[in-house]
């Protein structure tokens, strides 16, 4: 779920209600003898443009952008504009398949953020506005303040979780798109990062393609000695024994739609799993392992749906926090009753993914991959206090209550940003290829996992323990 590229597709109000404006712009580019400006429009326009930085990296000021167009009509001519400035002197022309490939240079003085690019299409005519994300370049800094120890594990590392009782670290891995045939749950020694146990999930039912119940999200239940995982591809969750990773229960496919995160309240005996892309959090009983009860979150935005992404649990206060991937909101849930206490707008973000919480300041930390920033929200007032540019593609965030610092994985930048509760960037640490997830052990140690770019990538598929020097 990285953000090294951007899908530039017209949606809703971005579509061509701007035909009159385009007609006026076209007058400056046509001769007096040109054809009618208001020609027949493309009533079934579906064109999309995908933009990607060099070799899959972030799009930044001065970088060369690779464009891939699709779903245009053969022969359509595409001109890109920023304001009144034409970005491609010669129009791109869709081939017989309705596609085109091109490159575009981002100006060296381009401001960071979502740049509104106008897509002017002719033959037949259409228009759309799309956001081209220009990511910040945040230099590595203050690396001497942290000791780093890394270990290469399995391909496709996804998440990790730490047992407060034993110090063991549990890591999930899954490789590729369906059918996913390679996936593991690993148990590590928290000190040495040595693998103490590992297991491959059971084969997925109803298929003969070799796919398994691939594991993605992970949460630790120290009260019952279990570890919970999400089976995103099968819309399910599973429970394993911490001691030897033997399977306790595999829930049926369809139990939790696109299950992502899972967190445990050991005192209440409840597990919560996010149904990504829906407004639902599934609530389980960790003793009976019965079918879950759904918690529905309603968006404050009229006509919009809260889309649950990551979860964070404050076990001491029995409060559950969730962020919405689609509506720039966060929700507070009472874990005791399973009811939503409030939904709060988060200003200045797009595509929120990660969430963490600081009980001392009552502040929520929201990592947003669509806007390349970390938002810090005061839950008492509901105000967004700070927005910190951390790098390209912030994906997850964890807050360490010992050193009182938030840690953000920037998937495309390949860094781990360290931010204090007041929005100050304390450090920006190298974290290999595609950092995916970060967690803390409550003792000052931080564990981050990343994914490799390929089989020969020495910097990927690693877990790294970051420990403050002082």
Placement of each model-derived feature along the sequence:
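Gram-negative bacterial Sec-dependent N-terminal signal peptides
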Residues: 1-33
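Predominantly soluble domains enriched in secretory-pathway, periplasmic, or organellar proteins
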Residues: 35-470
């Amino acid at each position: 779920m990285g953000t090294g590229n951007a899908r530039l597709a017209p949606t809703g109000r971005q579509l061509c209600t701007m035909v009159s404006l385009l007609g006026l712009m076209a007058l400056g580019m046509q001769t007096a003898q040109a054809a009618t400006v208001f020609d027949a429009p493309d009533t079934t326009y579906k064109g999309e443009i995908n933009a990607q930085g060099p070799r899959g990296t972030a799009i930044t000021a001065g970088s060369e952008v690779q464009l891939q167009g699709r779903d245009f009509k053969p022969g359509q001519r595409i001109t890109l504009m920023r304001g009144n400035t034409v970005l491609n002197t010669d129009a791109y022309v869709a081939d017989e398949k309705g596609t085109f490939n091109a490159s575009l240079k981002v100006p060296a003085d381009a401001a960071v953020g979502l740049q509104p690019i106008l897509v002017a299409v002719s033959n037949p005519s259409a228009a759309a506005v799309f956001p081209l994300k220009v990511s910040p370049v945040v230099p590595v800094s203050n690396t001497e303040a942290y000791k780093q120890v890394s270990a290469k594990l399995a391909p496709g590392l996804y998440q990790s979780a730490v047992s407060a009782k034993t110090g063991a670290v549990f890591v999930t891995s899954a490789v590729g798109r369906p059918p996913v045939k390679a996936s593991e749950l690993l148990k590590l020694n928290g000190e040495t990062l040595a693998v103490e146990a590992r297991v491959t999930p059971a084969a997925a039912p109803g298929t003969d393609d070799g796919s398994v119940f691939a594991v993605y999200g992970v949460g630790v239940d120290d009260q019952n000695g279990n570890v919970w995982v999400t089976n995103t591809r099968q819309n399910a969750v599973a429970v394993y024994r911490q001691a030897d990773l033997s399977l306790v229960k595999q829930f049926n496919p369809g139990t939790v739609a696109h299950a992502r995160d899972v967190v445990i309240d050991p005192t209440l005996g409840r597990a919560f799993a996010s149904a990504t892309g829906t407004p639902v959090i599934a609530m389980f009983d960790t003793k009976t392992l019965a079918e879950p009860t759904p918690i529905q979150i309603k968006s404050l935005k009229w006509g919009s749906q809260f889309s649950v992404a990551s979860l964070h649990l404050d076990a001491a206060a029995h409060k559950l926090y969730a962020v919405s991937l689609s509506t720039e909101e966060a929700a507070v849930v009472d874990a005791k009753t399973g009811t939503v206490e409030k939904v709060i707008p988060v200003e200045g973000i797009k595509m929120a993914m990660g969430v963490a919480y600081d009980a001392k300041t009552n502040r929520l930390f929201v990592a947003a991959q669509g806007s390349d920033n970390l938002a810090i929200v005061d839950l008492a007032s509901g105000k967004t206090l700070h927005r910190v540019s951390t790098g390209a593609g912030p994906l997850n965030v964890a807050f360490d209550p010992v050193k009182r610092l938030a840690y953000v994985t920037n998937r495309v930048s390949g860094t781990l940003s360290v931010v204090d509760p007041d929005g100050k960037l304390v450090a920006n640490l190298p974290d290999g290829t595609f950092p995916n997830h970060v967690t803390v052990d409550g003792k000052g140690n931080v564990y981050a996992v990343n994914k490799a770019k390929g089989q020969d990538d020495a910097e990927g598929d690693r877990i790294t323990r970051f420990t403050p020097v002082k």
